[in-house]
């Protein structure tokens, strides 16, 4: 079983996450153990995250097979980039592996840090030192456009935005771009939830 430990931050000291995922059942599975055509037989949507291909080369290959099968079967594929530097330890970089996988996804979720660290894409006109913990959503329209330009299969791009005031206070919002329209959520002040990860967008097909 893969587990993680959270050292909660205080005031200006950020929280720290420690991963213990080596030799977990999932990280050591063989790609040939799963029949993706059978698994996806009655499925309309496959969602994967960047945690999976980061765990091991076998896990990356399983993810690659799942996405390829979903593409062949006409199943919508969404991904959460979810970059975790500490997990990429088997000799391949996130950029090398994720570029191929994200290119075959129809919906991409991430934050500005994911896009920059994995793909080198930055929000135009954004200066983190000038934010004072507040995030201007319109600055990130360029991230959405750049990502969709790099990955033309993508039909929708979602960017989550967290402004860090201190270890105990964060602002939280998001933007969505569908290639034509740029949509923004309201901004929330989060004071009572540990920001280990974010709640994933629950995507539904438009009928």
Outline where the language-model segments fall.
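Conserved N-terminal subdomain of the carbohydrate kinase-like
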Residues: 1-51
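Active-site beta-loop-alpha junctions enriched in small/polar residues
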Residues: 22, 51, 82-86, 113, ...
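Glycine/threonine-rich flexible loop motifs
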Residues: 53-61, 120
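Hydrophobic faces of well-ordered beta-strands that scaffold small-molecule active sites
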Residues: 77-79
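Conserved phosphate/ATP/ADP-binding segment of small-molecule kinases
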Residues: 87-180
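Short pre-catalytic strand/loop immediately N-terminal to key active-site residues, enriched for Gly-Thr
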Residues: 183-197
């Amino acid at each position: 079983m893969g587990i993680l430990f959270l050292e909660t931050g205080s005031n200006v000291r950020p929280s720290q996450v420690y991963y213990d995922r080596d030799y977990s059942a999932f990280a050591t599975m063989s790609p040939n153990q799963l029949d993706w055509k059978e698994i996806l037989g009655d499925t309309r949507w496959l969602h994967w995250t960047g945690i999976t291909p980061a765990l091991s080369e076998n896990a990356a290959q399983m993810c690659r097979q799942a996405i390829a099968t979903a593409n062949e079967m006409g199943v919508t594929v969404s991904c959460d980039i979810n970059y975790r530097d500490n997990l990429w330890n088997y000799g391949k970089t996130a950029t090398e592996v994720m570029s191929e996988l994200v290119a075959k996804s129809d919906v991409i979720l991430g934050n500005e840090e994911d896009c920059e660290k994995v793909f080198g894409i930055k929000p135009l006109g954004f200066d983190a030192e000038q934010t004072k913990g507040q995030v201007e959503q319109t600055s990130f329209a360029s991230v959405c456009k750049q990502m969709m330009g790099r990955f033309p299969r993508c039909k929708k791009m979602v960017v989550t935005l967290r402004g860090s005031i201190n270890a105990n206070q964060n602002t939280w919002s998001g933007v969505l771009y569908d290639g034509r329209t740029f949509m923004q959520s309201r901004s929330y002040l989060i004071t009572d939830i540990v920001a280990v990860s974010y709640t994933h967008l629950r995507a539904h097909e438009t009928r």
